[in-house]
């Protein structure tokens, strides 16, 4: 259904902000305003009485990779770099059979200029990034980040949380969401939140992200569609997201001799 919809908002829920060591507790998808689904991920446990029917992480990753690799499907995230690092760091957990299947899901080569925009399409929706073939399959073939879009539309927004989903949901959408601090008490993590509360919070994040994208994209088309420089800036920001993510995951090589020379 998400593939058929053509665009879907995605959000990860983890037990910490460390994208390498954190546990992927679940994820949310939303492709229709006001309707979202939260998918809890099964956690490894030695307790036979603590097993659940939740989807296993490797199977969840495989299905998400299939969604992300679908040609023409826009995946929308808020602060995408976090979600991308969480998912990319788990690609190695796929079985050989799943890895072989993923190899057959082609994302395709990027169009000229690495952009999906054309002379007739200068909206934010037309400037998503087509990932190059070398990009890991857990990177969407077409990606938009509402946090970056909000920043480009208003780079002078004040406050350290001025681009948070919570703040933008209130100021742009007029929607008040569930407070994270109301769910997770001091000394706890999201893993301690009961499922009936976790799914409401997670699904709400994905729903807000989709609605925010539509609202910001409409504003972008109104204010920036006749400004080629703005279009190029958005295109560039979307292009570098996967690159920066890979750099932060794997590091970069520095020629210390050249730097000290």
Predicted regions and their residues:
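N- or domain-start disorder-to-order transition segments that initiate the globular core
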Residues: 1-6
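Short acidic, Gly/Ser-rich segments with clustered Asp/Glu that frequently serve as metal-coordination loops
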Residues: 7-8, 12-20
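Short loop/turn and capping residues at structural boundaries
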Residues: 12-13, 79, 181, 258
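Short glycine/serine/threonine-biased micro-segments
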Residues: 14, 24-26, 249
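Active-site-proximal helix-loop-helix substrate-binding element of RNase H-like nuclease domains
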Residues: 18, 22-105, 136-224, 234-236, ...
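Intrinsic disorder/low-complexity segments
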Residues: 94-138
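A short, flexible low-complexity segment enriched in Lys/Arg and Gly/Pro that occurs
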Residues: 227-231
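Extended, well-ordered alpha-helical scaffold/bundle regions in very large, multi-domain proteins
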Residues: 232-261
């Amino acid at each position: 259904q998400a593939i058929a919809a053509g665009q879907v908002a995605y959000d990860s829920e983890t037990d910490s902000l460390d994208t390498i060591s954190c546990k992927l507790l679940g994820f949310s998808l939303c492709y229709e305003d006001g309707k979202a689904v939260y998918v809890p991920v099964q956690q490894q446990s030695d307790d036979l009485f603590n097993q659940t029917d939740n989807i296993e992480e490797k199977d969840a990753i495989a299905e998400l990779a299939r969604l992300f690799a679908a040609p023409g499907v826009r995946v929308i995230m808020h602060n995408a770099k976090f979600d991308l690092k969480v998912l990319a760091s788990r690609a190695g957990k796929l079985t050989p059979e799943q890895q072989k299947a993923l190899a057959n899901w082609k994302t395709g080569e990027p169009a000229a200029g690495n952009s999906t925009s054309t002379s007739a399409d200068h909206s934010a929706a037309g400037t998503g990034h087509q990932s190059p073939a070398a990009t890991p399959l857990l990177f969407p073939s077409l990606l938009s980040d509402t946090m970056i879009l909000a920043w480009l539309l208003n780079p002078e927004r004040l406050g350290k949380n001025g681009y948070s989903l919570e703040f933008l949901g209130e100021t742009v959408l007029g929607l008040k969401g569930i407070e994270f601090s109301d769910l997770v008490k001091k000394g706890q993590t999201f893993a301690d939140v009961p499922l009936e509360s976790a799914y409401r919070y997670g699904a709400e994040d994905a729903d807000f992200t989709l609605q925010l994208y539509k609202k910001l994209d409409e504003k972008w088309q109104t204010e920036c569609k006749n400004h080629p420089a703005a279009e190029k800036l958005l295109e560039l920001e979307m292009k570098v997201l996967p690159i920066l993510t890979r750099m932060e995951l794997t590091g970069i090589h520095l020629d210390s001799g050249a730097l000290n020379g």
